[in-house]
């Protein structure tokens, strides 16, 4: 390789004291980094011969960063390759002379800490004779500090100095002169055979004076001798008496009230406090050995803890409640000592800093006392609520504790420790562990059997009721939330605690279902439906329902009839599908959250569908104020969780809501063990006003026409009417043969209910089969579901070829889409669709065997999950009446009822009873 004849280097100092170096060849072209290392750093030790250089090249120019010592070594030692001709830029030439001087001083070990700079609060290095000045002196100081890391012995010595004499960097303390400074920090050797230290002794009796003793420690043996004047010195030490005098002078200059006539001095309690908390630390920084009482470390690091000793509610009631005010007394604790409020006030009045109480020294901090008094005044003004205790206790149980508890606990009791009574401690243990809950027997009036997890749910609801807390039963769809509530209602009534009715607010589509479930499982309960144009209003409202056990109403009426509903303090207010109040700002949500009830219960398989504020709305109904204001909740949880996915905040929120939210899924082991492999559930739904009007008109017109018909014509008319009534029950557009209608769900309560079911199913990421007899209905459902959920929905019907059907089935089984609509005839037999674990029969087939065959598309060999079957039945219509007949003749169904033809054999009177719309239809 051809050697370079000439290299031009340019060195420039940066603001932080480091330097940059760039180099150019004879053609004034930037020297490549590899060439720069070879020709300039070949003998440069501190960069390990160019290995540890930081590249700070900028556009078009190669440059490296050098520390102060690296630059001194490079320029002052001339570490360049001897085969290179190195030239300097005009700006760099002055640096060569300075670097050479600095290098020579450092190489000779001619440097030491600068005492004058230290006294002004600055640490610097200087040469022994103080020759260097200006820029060279500044560079010298930086270079020495940098050089220390490259010299093992020097680095070890410097670390020892900083550890033994922190004053060198804290600038605390006092030294008599430069020699005292260098000797004190250990830069130069102290020739005396001993070191001088101080020991603080506490008084024998509280209030007496404290004592400081001077002692001498033998450098060789480590033995201690207490100094009692020059006469007490060993003969071999007497030559160093001036060392003791200088130390006494230094102690006095550092702590003006600290002076010695001999080796002992007495100080006041106030001076003892200053010595313990401030002066001793300054002296230690100066390298003085200080011996303090063994208890001081603990007392120094401790603060007095303000405690609220909580008994129970003011009247000692077992019924607590989220907003109940609790009785408490103040206690003050520190170092294992607990003081009453009176004892604490007596201490504060004494204006002392150190007090010996029951053999223990206690620190009294005036600033801390002021802070505690402010806390006490605020807490007493606002009162202690059960919600304050619960939030704190639940947060304390979270792994990792509460580093930012101020953001979580915003009550007046933030920073105050709770000392709970045994009663409250037991209650919180039951809330958090949800174990050992009081056992209640299922009422003999309950006409059914609760599975173990359902009985637990009833006990859990009753436990929260007895404790005064609202509850959210959030079990998976199909696990029996309704019957757990019914068992709860019966127990409350039979325990003699029911003075007013229970109120159930539910979507219109499930009011009929509640009526039937209550009638089936609790026929002894008096159930009233507050619905329809003839419902009681005004002053008649309360009297009308005073003898009812349960009143049912809809979400829509909860706002329309808010005045009437608010006039009663209900025994229980139960919200079914409680996510209906998720928007806290709607009139409906606000109206419901203002209703008064002894116990508030929310039922919801999806208590939070999209936003955390939905959860807040439900909890504000259940336990008002527990999660704070909506604004505060948004700041503490919504923003950190939804914006930043803050795992700690998620954990905190889970801790807060867990005691009041019970959720079991079909995948839970204790639930799965008690579930049948298949659950068939009937969903009872009313007709919309449009459906009811069309239904009644069709029945009237048909019976008017039927009187003139006989035989086959009569049978044909009945079958025609039957089919058209089923279409009306499905959707008015199906009966009216409307094409591409946009207003779908609002005209059919059954379709609204389908949307509710599908929302819950998709929230669990589960799959579903939907069976219908009508192609147009299937197309309507497909259109609506795709628009609602934004995902493809397939429809398997008779218009598809075999290959198309096979492809649909194969993709569904591979879970490429979660929802499959099937026409009953095309998809009811012969298919294996075990990817689904929900089956919805949107309209009924009068032969149960046909429905069962359709259900068995999912419930068959290969199905590894629990299968939930939903049969949708419009109340008061032909669908419900035939369902009742089928149930009552179940034994004969498979043998006799194989088609709809049996209906045509009924008498006209029987047909009128069967087809006429009942009062429960709307």
From Swiss-Prot:
Residues 753-907 form the Helicase C-terminal domain. It is an enzyme of class 3 (hydrolase). It comes from the Bacteria. Its EC number is 3.6.4.-. Gene3D superfamilies: P-loop containing nucleotide triphosphate hydrolases, Tandem AAA-ATPase domain. Disruption phenotype: No visible phenotype in presence or absence of DNA damaging agents H(2)O(2) or methyl methanesulfonate (MMS); a double ywqA deletion-pcrA depletion strain has 8-fold reduced cell viability. It holds the Pfam family SNF2-rel_dom. GO terms for biological process: positive regulation of transcription by RNA polymerase II. Interacts with the RNA polymerase core. This is Putative ATP-dependent helicase/translocase YwqA. The lineage of its organism: Bacteria, Bacillati, Bacillota, Bacilli, Bacillales.
């Amino acid at each position: 390789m051809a050697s370079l004849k000439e290299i031009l280097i340019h060195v420039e100092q940066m603001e932080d004291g480091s330097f940059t170096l760039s180099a150019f060849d004879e053609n004034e072209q930037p020297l490549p980094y590899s060439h720069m290392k070879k020709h300039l750093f070949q003998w440069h030790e501190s960069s390990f011969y160019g290995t540890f250089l930081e590249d700070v090249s900028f556009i078009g120019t190669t440059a490296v960063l050098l520390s102060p010592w690296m630059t001194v070594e490079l320029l002052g030692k001339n570490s360049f390759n001897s085969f290179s001709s190195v030239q300097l830029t005009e700006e760099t030439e002055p640096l060569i002379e300075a670097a050479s001087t600095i290098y020579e001083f450092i190489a000779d070990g001619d440097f030491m800490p600068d005492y004058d700079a230290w006294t002004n609060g600055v640490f610097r290095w200087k040469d022994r004779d103080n020759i260097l000045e200006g820029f060279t002196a500044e560079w010298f100081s930086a270079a020495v500090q940098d050089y220390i890391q490259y010299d093992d012995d020097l680095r070890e010595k410097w670390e020892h100095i900083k550890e033994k004499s922190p004053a060198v960097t804290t600038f605390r303390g006092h030294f008599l002169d430069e020699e005292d400074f260098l000797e004190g920090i250990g830069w130069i050797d102290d020739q005396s055979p001993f070191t001088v230290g101080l020991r603080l002794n506490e008084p024998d009796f509280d209030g007496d004076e404290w004592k400081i003793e001077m002692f001498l420690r033998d450098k060789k043996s480590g033995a201690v001798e207490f100094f009692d004047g020059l006469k007490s010195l060993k003969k071999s030490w007497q030559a160093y008496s001036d060392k003791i005098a200088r130390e006494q002078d230094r102690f006095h200059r550092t702590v003006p009230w600290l002076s010695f006539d001999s080796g002992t001095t007495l100080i006041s309690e106030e001076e003892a406090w200053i010595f313990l908390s401030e002066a001793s630390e300054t002296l230690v920084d100066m390298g003085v050995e200080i011996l303090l009482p063994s208890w001081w470390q603990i007392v120094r690091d401790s603060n007095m803890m303000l405690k609220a000793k909580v008994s129970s509610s003011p009247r000692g009631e077992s019924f607590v409640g989220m907003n109940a005010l609790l009785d408490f007394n103040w206690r003050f604790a520190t170092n294992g000592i607990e003081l009453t409020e009176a004892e604490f006030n007596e201490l504060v009045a004494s204006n002392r800093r150190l007090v010996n109480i029951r053999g223990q020294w206690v620190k009294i901090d005036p600033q801390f006392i002021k802070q505690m008094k402010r806390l006490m005044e605020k807490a007493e003004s606002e009162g202690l609520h059960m919600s304050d205790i619960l939030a704190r206790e639940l947060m304390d149980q979270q792994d990792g504790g509460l580093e930012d508890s101020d953001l979580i606990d915003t009550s007046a009791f933030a920073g105050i420790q709770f000392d709970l009574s045994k009663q409250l401690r037991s209650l919180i243990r039951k809330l958090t562990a949800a174990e050992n809950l009081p056992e209640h027997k299922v009422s003999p009036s309950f006409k059914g059997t609760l599975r173990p997890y359902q009985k637990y749910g009833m006990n859990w609801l009753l436990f929260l009721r007895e404790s005064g807390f609202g509850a959210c039963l959030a079990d998976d769809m199909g696990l029996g939330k309704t019957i757990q509530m019914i068992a709860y209602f019966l127990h409350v009534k039979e325990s003699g605690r029911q003075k007013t009715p229970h109120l159930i607010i539910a979507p219109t589509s499930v009011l009929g279902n509640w009526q039937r479930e209550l009638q089936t499982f609790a026929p002894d309960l008096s159930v009233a439906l507050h619905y329809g144009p003839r419902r009681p209003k005004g002053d008649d409202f309360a009297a009308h329902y005073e003898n009812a056990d349960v009143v049912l109403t809809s979400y829509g009426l909860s706002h329309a009839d808010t005045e009437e509903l608010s006039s009663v303090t209900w025994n229980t207010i139960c919200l079914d599908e409680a996510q209906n109040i998720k928007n806290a700002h709607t009139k409906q949500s606000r109206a419901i959250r203002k209703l008064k009830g002894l116990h508030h219960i929310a039922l919801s398989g999806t208590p939070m569908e999209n936003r955390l504020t939905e959860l807040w709305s439900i909890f504000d109904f259940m336990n008002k104020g527990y999660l704070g204001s909506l604004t505060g909740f948004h700041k503490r949880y919504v923003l950190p969780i939804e914006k930043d996915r803050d795992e700690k905040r998620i954990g905190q929120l889970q801790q807060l809501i867990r005691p009041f939210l019970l959720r079991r899924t079909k995948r839970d082991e204790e639930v799965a063990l008690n579930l049948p492999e298949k659950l068939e559930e009937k969903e009872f739904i009313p007709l919309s006003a449009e459906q009811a009007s069309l239904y009644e008109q069709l029945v009237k017109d048909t019976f008017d026409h039927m009187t003139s018909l006989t035989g086959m014509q009569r049978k044909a008319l009945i079958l025609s009417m039957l089919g058209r009534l089923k279409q009306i029950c499905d959707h008015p557009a199906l009966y009216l043969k409307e094409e591409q209608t946009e207003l779908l769900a609002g005209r059919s309560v059954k379709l609204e209910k389908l949307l509710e079911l599908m929302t819950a199913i998709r929230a669990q990421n589960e799959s579903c089969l939907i069976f219908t007899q009508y192609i147009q209905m299937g197309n309507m459902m497909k259109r609506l579901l795709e628009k609602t959920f934004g995902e493809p929905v397939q429809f398997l019907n008779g218009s598809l070829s075999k290959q198309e059907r096979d492809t649909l089935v194969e993709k569904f089984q591979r879970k490429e889409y979660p929802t499959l609509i099937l026409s009953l005839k095309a998809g009811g037999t012969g298919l294996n669709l075990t990817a689904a674990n929900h089956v919805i029969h949107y309209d009924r087939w009068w032969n149960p065997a046909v429905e069962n065959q359709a259900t068995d598309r999912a419930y068959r060999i290969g199905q590894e999950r629990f299968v939930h079957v939903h049969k949708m039945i419009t109340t008061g219509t032909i669908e419900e009446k035939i369902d009742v007949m089928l149930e009552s003749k179940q034994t004969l169904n498979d043998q006799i009822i194989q088609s709809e033809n049996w209906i045509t054999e009924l008498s006209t009177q029987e047909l009128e009873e069967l087809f006429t719309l009942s009062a429960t239809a709307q």
